[in-house]
């Protein structure tokens, strides 16, 4: 469904939607939360009696949840080890190295890790538009064994620490978002962009 926002701005600084912004996020400042919040997606603009109207498609919680479920693969590590090779991901219960539950992962999907643990790359990985998401309040150890990772980036939850002992692909940029901490333990051949949280460079 469509909504409408009316902007009235008598200040010198003007930051309004213009033609070409369709599809971009529309934000409002929430005085109670004291931060900018997403209210929807910009659909179009019009001018009525000197006021600019911005038409938006309202944020839809149900649809967003369905999209996240469709384009993510959830793995509950629960302190255990997981190995990733090509499209296979194997969870080793009780930190066993040889046996485990194997699942298929799909390119262009996010992998969501929960409850802390260890991740071992056994191949050069290309997630396409997919990234790696780590939940809140846990520690994760990522070991690349000389293999590289390429994808949309890393999202680290609040009070989580990700010890990154892996290589990011040199033809990509490591994007790090989320309030958690990325502890980079290996010298990288790629650039890094930080959207939020902390990054520790140890080499």
What do these predicted ranges mean?
Residues 1-14:
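Chymotrypsin/trypsin-fold serine protease catalytic domain
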Residues 35-38, 95-102, 142:
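Tryptophan-centered short beta-strand motifs
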Residues 115-186, 203:
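Extracellular, surface-exposed repeat architectures
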Residues 87, 180, 194-199:
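Glycine- and acidic-residue-biased ligand/ion/polar-headgroup-sensing regions
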Residues 46-47, 189-191, 203:
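A short acidic/small-residue loop/turn micro-motif
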Residues 16-90:
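C-terminal subregion of chymotrypsin/trypsin-like serine protease catalytic domains
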Residues 31-35, 170-173, 190-193:
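Surface-exposed loop/turn motifs in large extracellular/passenger domains
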Residues 81-111:
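Acidic Gly/Asp/Thr-rich repetitive segments characteristic of extracellular carbohydrate-active
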């Amino acid at each position: 469904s469509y909504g409408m926002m009316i902007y009235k701005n008598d200040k010198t600084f003007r930051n309004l939607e213009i033609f070409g912004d369709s599809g971009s996020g529309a934000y409002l400042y929430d005085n109670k939360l004291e931060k900018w919040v997403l209210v929807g997606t910009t659909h179009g603009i019009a001018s009525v009696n000197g006021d600019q109207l911005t038409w938006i498609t309202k944020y839809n919680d149900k649809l967003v949840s369905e999209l996240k479920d469709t384009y993510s693969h959830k793995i509950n590590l629960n302190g255990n080890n997981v190995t990733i090779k090509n499209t296979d991901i194997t969870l080793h219960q009780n930190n066993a190295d040889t046996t485990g539950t194997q699942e298929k992962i799909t390119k262009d999907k996010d992998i969501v890790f929960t409850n802390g643990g260890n991740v071992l790359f056994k191949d050069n990985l290309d997630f396409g538009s997919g990234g790696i998401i780590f939940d809140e309040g846990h520690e994760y150890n990522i070991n690349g064994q000389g293999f590289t990772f390429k994808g949309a980036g890393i999202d680290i939850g609040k009070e989580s620490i990700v010890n990154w002992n892996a290589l990011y692909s040199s033809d990509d940029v490591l994007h790090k978002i989320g309030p958690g901490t990325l502890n980079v333990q290996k010298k990288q051949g790629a650039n890094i962009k930080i959207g939020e949280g902390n990054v520790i460079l140890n080499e």
